[in-house]
Amino acid sequence: MARSVAVVFLMLLSVVCLDAIQRPPQVQVYTRHPPEDGKTNFLNCYVSQFHPPQIEIELLKNGKKMDKVELSDLSFNKDWSFYLLAHTEFTPTATDKYACRVTHTTLKEPKVVTWERDM
């Protein structure tokens, strides 16, 4: 009985400790294929290494939220940090600017990462 109580106590303690972990997200913005003006492609925003799991990810075109953005299932690493992929179909042009905006409790303000076309 005492052993069972100790095991339950350790499990609860580990859950509480996990909730105390705070890690800011790492953000990468890239396309599925090399970009060509006027040719359909996919814009991806890969957000990783964050905790807790509550997060908001938006893809932006010229500063405005894009429609039809899909999210992968929330997944986690061995260290309990989380990762998520937001993506949408888009047709790049030379004049349009694309970015990913991430809102998370570890950030004082949303993190905006611009898509660097030449990367």
UniProtKB/Swiss-Prot annotation:
CDD domains reported in the protein's UniProt record: IgC1_beta2m (cd05770)
GO cellular component: cytosol; external side of plasma membrane; extracellular region; Golgi apparatus; HFE-transferrin receptor complex; MHC class I peptide loading complex; MHC class I protein complex
Keyword Nuclease: no
Disulfide bond annotation, renumbered to this chain: 45-100
InterPro entries named in the record: B2Microglobulin, Ig-like_dom, Ig-like_dom_sf, Ig-like_fold, Ig/MHC_CS, Ig_C1-set, MHC/Immunoglobulin
Domain Ig-like C1-type as annotated: residue spans: 25-114
Pfam families per record: C1-set
Statement: the UniProt record of this protein carries the keyword Magnesium: no
Gene3D superfamilies associated with the record: Immunoglobulins (2.60.40.10)
GO terms, biological process: amyloid fibril formation; antigen processing and presentation of endogenous peptide antigen via MHC class I; antigen processing and presentation of exogenous protein antigen via MHC class Ib, TAP-dependent; cellular response to iron(III) ion; cellular response to nicotine; intracellular iron ion homeostasis; iron ion transport; learning or memory
Keyword terms of this UniProt record: Disulfide bond, Immunity, Immunoglobulin domain, MHC I, Secreted, Signal
Molecular function GO labels: protein homodimerization activity; structural molecule activity
Signal peptide span: 1-20
Subcellular location: Secreted
Function: Component of the class I major histocompatibility complex (MHC). Involved in the presentation of peptide antigens to the immune system.
The protein's assembly and partners: Heterodimer of an alpha chain and a beta chain. Beta-2-microglobulin is the beta-chain of major histocompatibility complex class I molecules.
Family to which this protein belongs: Belongs to the beta-2-microglobulin family.
Protein name in UniProt: Beta-2-microglobulin
